Amino acid sequence: MPKNKDESQKAIVRTYYIIEGDKIKLKNKKCPRCGSIMAHHMKPVERWACGKCGYTEFIGKGK
């Protein structure tokens, strides 16, 4: 465990964006419920998930 909160590993925000010419574009989707950036998961089922509010969008065919 880190001694201070500052010593803990933080997310690298610069990996969330792509620079295209003079525009900055977000790589991932934004959560429609709370507005934070969602994570894309492939296993066990492909889905977009929000770590802040728990919102999940499943991708692909339903069984």
Curated annotation (Swiss-Prot):
Keyword Zinc recorded: yes
Keyword Transferase among record annotations: no
Keywords per UniProt: Metal-binding, Ribonucleoprotein, Ribosomal protein, Zinc, Zinc-finger
Domain of life: Archaea
InterPro entries per record: Ribosomal_eS31 (IPR002906), Ribosomal_eS31_arc (IPR022845), Ribosomal_zn-bd (IPR011332)
Cofactor section: Zn(2+)
Note on how the cofactor is bound: Binds 1 zinc ion per subunit.
A GO molecular-function annotation: zinc ion binding
Zinc fingers typed C4-type, residue spans: 31-53
Binding site for Zn(2+): C31, C34, C50, C53
GO BP of this protein: translation
Disulfide-linked positions: none
Name of a matching Pfam family: Ribosomal_S27
Gene Ontology cellular-component annotations: ribonucleoprotein complex; ribosome
Family (UniProt): Belongs to the eukaryotic ribosomal protein eS31 family.
NCBIfam families (UniProt xref): PRK00432.1
Subunit structure: Part of the 30S ribosomal subunit.
Protein name: Small ribosomal subunit protein eS31
Source organism of this protein record: Sulfurisphaera tokodaii (strain DSM 16993 / JCM 10545 / NBRC 100140 / 7)
